[in-house]
Amino acid sequence: MSLSDPLGDMLTRIRNAQRARHAVCVAPASKLRASVLEALKREGYIRGFAAEELRKGVAQLRIELKYVEGQPVIKEIHRVSKPGRRVYSKIKELPRVYAGLGVSILSTPRGVLSDVEARAANVGGEVLCRVF
C-alpha cells in the first residue's frame, strides 16, 4: 500500500494509540520518522523507540508512549507541513506553540530539531508538526 504522507500516518498512529491508552505503537520505519521520534524523545513526549527488522529490507519502529498519572503526555499532535502544502519558517517568524508549553518539530539543514533547539542553533526550516 502506498501512503501519500508517511509522517502524517505515524503521527495518527501515535494519536490513536494514546487515546486507546496503549503502552506501545508500531509504524513502518524510515530515517525521517526516526529523526522525528528522536526529537520527541529529547523533548520528553515519548519514553523511547526502537527499530525492529521484520525481514530483510523491511523494518518497523516500536514507539513506547509516555503517560503521567494515567494521562497521555501528548495532548495534541498535528501535521503542519503536508505533501500538498509545504510550510517553511524563518526562525524569527516561528510562533511559539501554546506560549512555549508545546513544541514544533522542524526539518532544518542541521537535521530534525525542536523549535527550542532550532532557536538555539539559529536555523529555520520546514515545520513538520506541532506537539502539545
Curated annotation (Swiss-Prot):
- A GO CC term? ribonucleoprotein complex
Which Gene Ontology MF annotations are present? rRNA binding; structural constituent of ribosome
The keyword Ribosomal protein is assigned to this record: yes
- Do you know which SUPFAM superfamilies this protein is assigned to? Ribosomal protein S8
> Which InterPro entries does this chain map to?
Ribosomal_uS8, Ribosomal_uS8_CS, Ribosomal_uS8_sf
For this UniProt record, give its keywords in alphabetical order, as a comma-separated list: Ribonucleoprotein, Ribosomal protein, RNA-binding, rRNA-binding
Q: What are the GO BP annotations of this UniProt entry?
A: translation
Q: Which HAMAP family match?
A: Ribosomal_uS8_B
Function statement: One of the primary rRNA binding proteins, it binds directly to 16S rRNA central domain where it helps coordinate assembly of the platform of the 30S subunit.
Q: How does it assemble?
A: Part of the 30S ribosomal subunit. Contacts proteins S5 and S12.
Could you tell me what this protein is called? Small ribosomal subunit protein uS8
